């Protein structure tokens, strides 16, 4: 339970700051705010090293969560600022791919160092060194001049992109089964009897995302945003139903089930990989340039809320029933998301898009 508190306080802190970070990034110069949040995020690794109590460690964890929420919105917004509009989808695709690689390499490297007998102090020092290198790279990025904006009265649309709410609902529904997958797929594989190393599931998922980023961004830049998302939705719907069916395939043929299991990972990687930059671009295109930060924070907040709901509902359904029922429920949610996107989000986007 203590570990759960430590892990969750980081996520909750990041989620709480996201709407406000969009407002600050739209109101003030973006790069200085981004670098300030990056610096705070970086120094928290030094804080972990000197933390002498669990309370202090949790406090540093919360501060790092807040700074992470700001850094993710800030980095994404800076990328949008420096990319020409004709290649924005492609740029967001490669930027997202770098995040996916980092999220895979980071935990893997930490576990490798820990298994090699390294102390947590050494691991935190390595993390601090990596952040310092990233901070230097971020400092070298040249951003365009952002003219001062007239201070508008505080209102809801300064924190949430109201025109993006339908897209946010669709994305939230889509991220619930994604959250179930990232947190419980290894337990699901063990429950149904797949003996292969389930860590390869995420490897294949990362490969799928990398493959999709090669071509999806360029298609988005040609204006086919809703078409790309629709294609990704069809692929993801099929994949989640196939994942839930693995419980029946295992009783027929273990080898076939294992192949299908890892094929699902590849398909999910491609499906989500083509949708990420498309969804991001969709939110940005619904917002004026002065609200790019708000658009990005709305996009990321929708995704994070869905991930959190997926963690909770997936665990609950598996507890009262089985994991395959949880993934079947997730597959049904993707159908709802697909129908809602095609019926509501796409028409709303084409009606309200600014570019």
Map each language-model feature to its residues:
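Paired small-residue
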Residues: 55-63, 259-267
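Helix-breaking motifs and short loop linkers at transmembrane-helix boundaries and internal kinks
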Residues: 29, 50-56, 224, 246-247
């Amino acid at each position: 339970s203590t570990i759960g508190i430590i892990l969750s306080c980081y996520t909750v802190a990041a989620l709480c700051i996201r709407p406000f970070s969009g407002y600050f990034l739209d109101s003030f110069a973006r790069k200085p705010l981004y670098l300030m949040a990056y610096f705070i995020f970086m120094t928290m690794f030094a804080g972990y090293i000197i933390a002498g109590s669990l309370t202090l460690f949790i406090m540093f964890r919360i501060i790092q969560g807040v700074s992470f929420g700001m850094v993710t919105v800030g980095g994404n917004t800076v990328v949008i600022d420096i990319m020409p509009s004709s290649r924005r989808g492609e740029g967001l695709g490669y930027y997202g791919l770098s995040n996916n690689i980092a999220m895979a390499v980071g935990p893997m490297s930490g576990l490798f160092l820990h298994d090699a007998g390294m102390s947590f102090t050494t691991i935190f020092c390595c993390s601090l060194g990596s952040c310092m290198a990233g901070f230097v790279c971020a400092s070298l990025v040249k951003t365009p001049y952002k003219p001062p904006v007239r201070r508008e009265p505080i209102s809801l649309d300064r924190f949430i992109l109201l025109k993006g709410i339908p897209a946010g609902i669709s994305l939230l529904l889509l991220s619930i089964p994604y959250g179930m997958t990232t947190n419980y797929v290894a337990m699901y594989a063990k429950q149904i009897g797949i003996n292969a190393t389930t860590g390869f599931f995420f490897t294949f998922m990362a490969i799928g995302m990398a493959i999709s980023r090669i071509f999806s961004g360029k298609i988005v830049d040609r204006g086919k945003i809703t078409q790309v998302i629709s294609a990704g939705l069809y692929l993801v719907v099929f994949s989640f139903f196939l994942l839930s069916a693995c419980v029946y395939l295992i009783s027929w043929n273990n080898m076939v089930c294992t192949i299908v299991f890892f094929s699902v990972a590849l398909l999910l990687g491609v499906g989500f990989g083509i949708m990420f930059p498309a969804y991001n671009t969709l939110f940005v295109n619904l917002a004026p340039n002065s609200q790019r930060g708000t658009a990005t924070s709305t996009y990321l907040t929708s995704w994070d809320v869905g991930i959190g709901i997926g963690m909770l509902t997936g665990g609950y359904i598996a507890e009262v029933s089985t994991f395959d029922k949880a993934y079947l429920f997730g597959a049904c949610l993707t159908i709802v998301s697909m129908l809602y996107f095609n019926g509501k989000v796409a028409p709303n986007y084409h009606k309200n898009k600014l570019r």
